[in-house]
Amino acid sequence: MQKSLVIVESPAKAKTINQYLGSEYIVKSSIGHIRDLTKGKLYNKEKNKKFLNENFIEKTNENKILIKQMGIDPYQNWKFEYHILPGKEKIISELKYIANQVKHIYLATDLDREGEAIAWHLKEVIGGDSSKFSRVVFNEITQHSIQKAFKNVGHINMNRVHAQQARRFMDRIVGYMISPLLWKKIARGLSAGRVQSVAVRIIADRESIIKNFVPEEYWKLDVSLISQDKKKINMDVTHYNNKKFRPINENEVSFAVEKIQKSSCIVKNYEEKISYLKAPAPFITSTLQQSASLRLGFSVKKTMFLAQKLYEEGYITYMRTDSNYLSEYAIKKVRKYIKSNYGSNYLPKEPNIYSNEKHSQEAHEAIRPSDIKIKNIDSDHLNSSAKKLYELIWNQFLASQMKSVKYKSITVTVLADMFKLQKSERIVMFQGWNKVLIEEKNVFSQFPILQTGSQLFINKVTPSQKFTKPPPRFSEASLVRELEKKGIGRPSTYSAITSKIQDRGYVKIKKNKFYAEKMGEILTIRLKKSFSNLIDYNFTAHMEKKLDQVAENKVTWRYLLDDFFKKFSEQLEQAKKSPEEGGMELNNIVPTSLNCPICCKKMGIKTAITGVFLSCLGYNNTDNKKRCKKTINLITLNDFNKEQDNQKKISLQLIQKCDICNMYMDSYFINEKLKLHICANNPSCSGYKFEKGVFKSPIYLSKTIQCEKCYNNMKLKIGPFGKFFTCINKICKNTRKILPNGEISDPKLEPIPFPELLCKQSDAWFVLREGISGIFFAANTFPKSRETRSPFVEELVRFQHLLPEKIYYLSSAPVIDNYGNKTIVCFDKKKKTHYIASKKDGKFTGWSAVFIDQKWCVINK
């Protein structure tokens, strides 16, 4: 009997689907995308000038080169050129071979637009009769869904493919056509993105608000009252003379205290009412990312990686969705579960229905467990983090179909002369969905029952000084919420956005909060001026709606791209002009009064992708022999000063203001005796101030580090991933990281090759390396192969002649535990020491051994 071929994206997904299909199906994986637009290095006119004649570097020829590099031609009706991704040739050959042997091909890639595009690419590359191909779509990898999907096969939706393709082309145009301009005008290594630049703007705008914020003083009054039955009630003063009470200084609050203390306090109103809090909606991608960040501390990237694993293993529905829709089948199952396990009291008469958000795309289901009966996952294929995420999804889905929480809300209003005092509390009358989401349960103290007109007696009046606070910095969770609120990007892109803007060096995360880097601020200002549409919130959201219309066949993809490119190219040509002609401003160096310690010329303030630093003006000398390359690193105060949460302290800090434009100034350390304050508008504003004194500086500024390899000194440098020390010996090239706490990392081992130990996932072999989590084996072909694992002790014993003195003691550890299980090397991050543990069937046994006083001591749990 001739078989059929089923193609999916991932091996894990293929393995799970294979369990539900019969022997007449061959399930294979494409391992993601198989082809993409042609990609070449961006053309740099200045760099390539010497290789080209004058005619060749004319504008038209520059465009030809750029078009070839982009793989798309906006001037020729959006012609495009795709190429097979490196490493996918073998996969494609296998798929083509099998495709020729089977009677039918089912393209079972993911149900979103990206999955639709992958299905189309597979069909194009495999080729053959179109009638031989069918599109299969399912929301969850369960036997019920798979069988249902294969009974209702369809065809590739080219409208959705065009929507994905239009997005891809637009992003390629923006990235490839703006980046060379940014290199020329601002700094090398910069890039712009249709969505990423808007995300950077959100963070940079918030950064500006925070830095410009001036705390304002205000006071609150807390009045402790005693009822006639001797019970205490604490109330807030909310109004004075029917106006909101908000004293701004101590004199005003002292007047209020005196007045209230002399007044009679009479209960004006005591109100009780019943209120209900509806169950939260099941997760969509953005709310899952936010909840996982807030409740589990997961990054957006980690959340999506784990959700992908859960989906591929068949535990949850598809994880990229912006729809709250739940199928009748899922609702029926969960209602039955609630009734059986919690009783009819917790089950609403009708299912809870949640309307989709205004930005929702196709009617996918919300994220939910595939089987509500599976409360906890018992699988060796998934780690504890994946299991925690599943539990979060399970609880949210179950709670979404339970009854509302019932509250009794109590509000008390008291009059004291012209002052109004108020207090509101609520008591849980019925837990409802809080029975599942225990962490959201509200616990409140109860008021004494008060009669209207009854008198209360003043026990104490307590004034407290407060200061207004700036809006908080964005966390990953709140940034995703802001992107969703503004309609920027899609659920499937949030993870890539938050990762990319960090990788580019435009923002950084510190203590789970986003900070805009100086280059991110400069880039935002330049793009706002030269590409106002591109970086506008409404324009970006509008473009998402237009892409939706392409997917719905309401707008043609070429028309959308033509309309976008016409306006974009006009702005691009204007931005290329000189600043005097209205073009994009340059990232000019700002001269200072500080002399270069080498050539005595002046040092200037310069901003690059690595940060702000001082550079000798002698670097611009046309004579290379006379060019001075001296630079001085500037360390921001935020890098080692803890944030002051006490707003009173903030208000008393001396805020440096620019003498030229009155803008706030960023402060930097040069050394223990010199600070530099730079106008936040730099380089557009040349304002700066030096401050002399004796300052407490970071540990690494006052230390002289010696290279452990060649014994030369090491100097401080700043790279894309932070500060580090590098050996002054150019041949040595040794580096040492600076840890987040300001300490310098210990020297790491040189990689040790183990060609005898072969990898399982590729043809590579292992190399012993040392990282922040101790020693580990990694593939020698990294990053092509990212396979890693812990070393077995028996392997270290076998090759102990290769081990350096630092870890030689590990070869004397027990090779097996008391039960014959092999032991592996582990690392204790708190103690920063290695220890030995054993595993059985992929799980730790509880047996371990530590090295104390030159011997191994066994610990059994």
UniProtKB/Swiss-Prot annotation:
Residues 191-196 are annotated as: Interaction with DNA. Residues 157-572 form the Topo IA-type catalytic domain. One of its GO terms (biological process) is DNA topological change. SUPFAM superfamilies: Prokaryotic type I DNA topoisomerase, Zinc beta-ribbon. Mg(2+) binds at E9, D110. Its EC number is 5.6.2.1. A zinc finger (C4-type) spans 596-628, 658-685, 707-732. It catalyses: ATP-independent breakage of single-stranded DNA, followed by passage and rejoining. Belongs to the type IA topoisomerase family. NCBIfam families: topA_bact. This is DNA topoisomerase 1. The gene is topA.
